[in-house]
């Protein structure tokens, strides 16, 4: 930081409301810094609070504000650090917060917790923490991101499933191996290399190597991958199918040693949803921020596909268990720190009444998730026989309002 003669004579407070989190435009952060510097050219500045909510269970390769993914949190912190380091009048900064902490009034992905920490409640190291450690630590270091994501799933048309893996290091390039095979050499940008890694079904060992100031650095992680076929011509996976609706998020469930995958549209011979739109709350943010009662797996129920016509899976003949997950969604009350996330008009989607028909048989009649309570997890388990090549065809027939589905699981008996 450049020294300014009058830096500590007069304190100045600047309105920074976590641009890119509570405010939608992340680039407004550096615009405000430059604007303040133009008004106070002889004084240095400190950014005393910034952060984004991160749930270590949630991941997305299409990260967006308020999805609580590790990937959006990393994107946010990389941007802030880069922009502050560009400006010699920024004397320092303070991340909000070192670790997650309890906050009773909050909903979000982890209710009653402020998840802006770069460490979890259990002090697990989120990707943002590893990034700062590699960029600001005294000793040369390299860290592979996604350390918390032990159980993963990915759709593929081959025996391999490619997934981007971040590597953090103060070097120009990184060599990455998977299962002792060279994946490639990847260039870094802002201290992050994104390696496209080919995973196989089962346990995979990923290793990364680089050189920092003449010192060799490396790291390794173990990933348990379930490669889910895009079609079931060769059989249905014994580990089943677990799909969340209305988002591009993955959610790891360590208790069940599995990973929920994001939805995809149905293709002939494969599986997926038919019709509908993604539920977005006022302010165009993903899903709801309400505390979902009756579960600790809130992210599964906080997103939703509305006006869905069907979910189809062209599975082999046999007996299957279909588990449908629903929640009647309504926005949580607007909080003073997050007014921009709520529009003037509240959405009320509690009037959603419909029938569910599976392979021509009505299994739920005049179903309304709101009958069980608003923002409450509702689970319906159905046994069905797929025969004569018909596969599984779950139809949602509207009676009043919109049909909807939050998540679906399919197992073969």
Predicted regions and their residues:
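Substrate-binding/catalytic cleft of secreted carbohydrate-active enzymes
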Residues: 1-124, 128, 132, 141, ...
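Carbohydrate-binding surfaces of carbohydrate-active enzymes
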Residues: 83-239
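Short, glycine-/Ser/Thr-/acidic-enriched flexible segments
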Residues: 9-11, 52-53, 100, 125, ...
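Compositionally biased, intrinsically disordered or flexible polar/acidic segments
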Residues: 228-413
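Generic beta-strand/beta-sheet core signal
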Residues: 6-7, 48, 96, 168-170, ...
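A short acidic/small-residue loop/turn micro-motif
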Residues: 12, 184, 190, 364-366, ...
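A structural signal for short secondary-structure junctions
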Residues: 38-40, 87-88, 158-160, 168-170, ...
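Generic recognition of flexible, low-complexity loop/linker segments
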Residues: 33-35, 80-83, 151-154, 162-165, ...
């Amino acid at each position: 930081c450049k020294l300014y003669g009058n830096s500590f004579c007069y304190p100045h407070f600047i309105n920074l409301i976590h641009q890119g989190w509570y405010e939608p435009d992340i680039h407004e952060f550096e615009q405000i810094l430059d604007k303040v510097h133009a008004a106070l050219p002889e004084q240095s500045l400190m950014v005393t609070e910034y952060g984004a909510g991160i749930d270590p269970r949630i991941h997305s390769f299409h990260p967006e504000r308020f999805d609580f993914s590790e990937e959006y949190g990393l994107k946010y912190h990389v941007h802030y650090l880069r922009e502050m380091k560009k400006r010699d009048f920024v004397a320092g900064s303070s991340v909000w917060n070192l670790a997650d902490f309890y906050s009773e009034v909050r909903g979000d992905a982890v209710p009653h917790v402020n998840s802006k920490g770069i460490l979890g409640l259990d002090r697990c190291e989120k990707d943002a923490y590893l990034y700062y450690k590699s960029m600001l630590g005294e000793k040369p270091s390299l860290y592979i991101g996604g350390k918390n994501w032990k159980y993963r799933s990915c759709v593929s048309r081959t025996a391999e499933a490619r997934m981007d893996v971040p590597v953090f290091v103060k070097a120009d390039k990184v060599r990455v191996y998977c299962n002792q095979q060279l994946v490639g050499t990847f260039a870094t940008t802002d201290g992050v290399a994104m390696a496209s890694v080919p995973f196989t079904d089962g346990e995979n060992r990923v290793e990364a190597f680089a050189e920092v100031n003449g010192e060799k650095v490396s790291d390794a992680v173990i990933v348990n991958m379930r490669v889910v076929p895009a079609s079931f011509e060769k059989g249905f996976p014994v580990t089943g199918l677990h799909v969340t609706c209305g988002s591009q998020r993955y959610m790891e469930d360590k208790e069940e040693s599995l990973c929920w995958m994001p939805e995809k549209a149905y293709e002939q011979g494969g599986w997926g949803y038919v019709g509908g739109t993604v539920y977005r709350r006022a302010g165009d943010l993903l899903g709801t921020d309400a505390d979902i009662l009756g579960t600790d797996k809130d992210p599964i129920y906080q997103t939703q596909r509305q006006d869905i016509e069907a979910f189809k899976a062209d599975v082999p003949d046999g007996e299957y268990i279909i588990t449908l997950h629903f929640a009647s969604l309504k926005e949580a009350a607007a909080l003073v720190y997050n007014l921009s996330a709520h529009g003037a008009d509240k959405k009320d989607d509690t009037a959603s009444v419909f029938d569910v028909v599976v392979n021509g048989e009505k299994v739920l009649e005049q179903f309304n998730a709101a009958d069980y309570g608003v923002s409450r997890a509702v689970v319906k388990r159905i046994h069905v026989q797929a025969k004569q090549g018909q596969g599984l065809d779950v139809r949602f027939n509207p009676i009043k309002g919109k049909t909807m589905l939050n998540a679906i699981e399919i197992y073969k008996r």
